[in-house]
């Protein structure tokens, strides 16, 4: 379980601590940092994975260089330049000491804390700007010295998996079959309407038992009987429909509630044992709708 997230110099946040618990709902005005908090969790996980891939099984060396991360690899945080990750786009501090200009890097610090197996753990990462296309990631420094000791990466943190699901717009009428990597890229770019049939197809093909649970849930909630997704080789597309009141309909004919619920269920089953981050910017309008 995650308990707290500390964010420094990331996008709209200069320095903030976010208390986390078993289930958390972020509520606030537009552009107040709700999505940014989720993206900070995603960036922390991306950095940790890249670090562990390169330095797995090794002790953290004091002078070890950071792992390079390309901004295009952070598909859930799409920006035209890596500089947009930094608070107010500031990647360097410029000052003057005894008439001499002094510069220093502005680092993004992300510290995640949690509890696992009745033990508390704390894992901090720092990110240094390299250029518009990439940045460096390394374990968080423990002091501000020239060659600082660095925070150890706890074993409990290595197993954390985070899946970020942006809001869904209107469902596309056709959908080309995609590999898993392409699905993740489109989800990260917010193009969830282009992958719903692909997610259904993956679950139906690889996890038929879970697909039955999904279809049963949709039928009980919406009275719609989902058909199995079918790959149409001639067009390279995935076709899928449902039946309601004895009428066969294409999935694009379903209501937004049905489509969004199906997206959430398939995404959860496609990312088992993961912390699911759901971004729904229109959720605050539900109170207004109920008043009408």
Question: Model-found features: residue ranges?
Answer:
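Residues at beta-strand starts and edge strands
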Residues: 1, 14, 102-108, 119-121, ...
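Switch/communication elements of ASCE P-loop NTPase nucleotide-binding domains
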Residues: 1-57, 228-292
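Conserved P-loop NTP-binding catalytic core
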Residues: 40-120
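Extended helical coiled-coil dimerization/tether regions that scaffold
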Residues: 111-115, 140-142, 146, 159-275, ...
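A short, surface-exposed beta-strand/turn
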Residues: 117-142, 261
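Short, conserved catalytic or adaptor-binding loops enriched in Gly and charged residues
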Residues: 153-157
């Amino acid at each position: 379980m995650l308990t707290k997230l500390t964010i420094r110099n990331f996008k709209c946040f200069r320095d903030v601590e976010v208390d986390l618990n078993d289930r958390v709902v972020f509520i606030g005005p537009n552009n107040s940092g709700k999505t940014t908090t989720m993206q900070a969790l995603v960036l922390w996980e991306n950095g940790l994975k890249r670090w562990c891939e390169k330095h797995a099984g090794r002790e953290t060396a004091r002078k070890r260089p950071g792992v390079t991360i390309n901004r295009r690899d952070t598909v859930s945080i799409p920006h035209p330049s890596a500089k947009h990750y930094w608070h107010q786009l500031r990647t360097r501090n410029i000052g003057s000491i005894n008439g001499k200009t002094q510069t220093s890097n502005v680092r993004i610090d992300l510290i995640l804390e949690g509890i696992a197996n009745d033990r508390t753990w704390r894992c901090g990462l720092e990110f240094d700007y390299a250029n518009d296309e990439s940045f460096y990631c390394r374990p968080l420094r423990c002091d501000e010295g020239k060659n600082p000791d660095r925070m150890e990466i706890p074993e409990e943190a290595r197993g954390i998996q985070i899946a970020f699901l942006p809001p869904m717009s209107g469902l596309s009428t056709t959908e080309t079959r995609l590999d898993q990597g392409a699905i993740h890229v489109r989800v990260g770019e917010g193009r969830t309407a282009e992958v719903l049939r692909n997610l259904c197809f993956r679950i139906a093909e690889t996890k038929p038992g879970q697909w039955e649970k999904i279809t049963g849930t949709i039928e009980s909630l919406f009275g719609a009987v989902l058909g199995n997704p079918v790959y149409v080789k001639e067009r390279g597309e995935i076709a899928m429909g449902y039946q309601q009141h004895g009428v066969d309909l294409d999935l694009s004919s379903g209501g937004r509630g049905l489509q969004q619920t199906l997206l959430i269920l398939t995404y959860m089953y496609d990312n088992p044992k993961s912390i699911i981050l759901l971004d729904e910017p229109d959720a605050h309008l539900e109170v207004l709708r109920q008043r009408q």
